[in-house]
């Protein structure tokens, strides 16, 4: 196989010469499949060499652990504004050279003038210990009004087969241009933060699950320093302030009848600081293929956002499905004119289809009040290699 034997041995948590444990043997298939390296893992076969000594025979079929994910969206013309395309490219190299190391890159064009990039690396089992470390860099160019850069260092400790905790330290820098500063009141700032989180994952497949639960939550605390421009640092502006950021992701997958599955996802984000009005650069974005279908990418912003994804799926195969969906979103933000909060509903249908080029995805979503031909089309391609 491509995956090195030492990687398999450390993941099954059984050492050579260890006393036989039926409980550990029963966990082998699940542990290896959750890595995402293998297409198939057979049940271990116990054999004896002499007396009470023996071994385990493991048969695995190497999978395609690296992925290319591309999405193309089209926002139709509205009034005097012409329609335009949006796009996303995700490249994930999972199990580099069979070592379990991972490298990923991301690029996204959200609208005419906004794009972001990111790069991440993960080193598993640092120095042979069950300790995974990683780091990342990201940059967002938002509407030509400001640039946001993030650096982070992460540590993950597996506690159980499906449960792990994470810790993170990072730095965020906001660099507005003159338009962002004087028209929108954005300040040049630097934030140092630390976060802790927990993750639980019992899904039977990462790309097309039929059953299981995924849960992740993080709590981040930071110290923000506003640096300028000097004319905007008035007495009403706090030079230094504390920040808190909370995230929650919860997903359920339940089979109902043969090939029919209900998928529910609940997601929430909240940002709190000592500032009366949270700057645009600290707000969360809502809308688009991965949050609220039927609306443009990042169409809404708020210091608090939440969305519910509901899908009724018909399972077509290992990597294929068709579905009906309804997405319900909420966002709120404190503005100079008062508090703004709204609920949004999107609905539609879509499919994921395994082809020779990869997994093709297409969602057609309508926002509440849209006519039948006025929806948003989200097209994507996931290629495993």
Region spans (language model):
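Flexible hinge/switch segments at interdomain interfaces of large molecular machines
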Residues: 1-8, 211
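A short pocket-lining beta-strand/turn micro-motif at the edge of beta-sheets
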Residues: 306, 318-322, 343-347, 355-360, ...
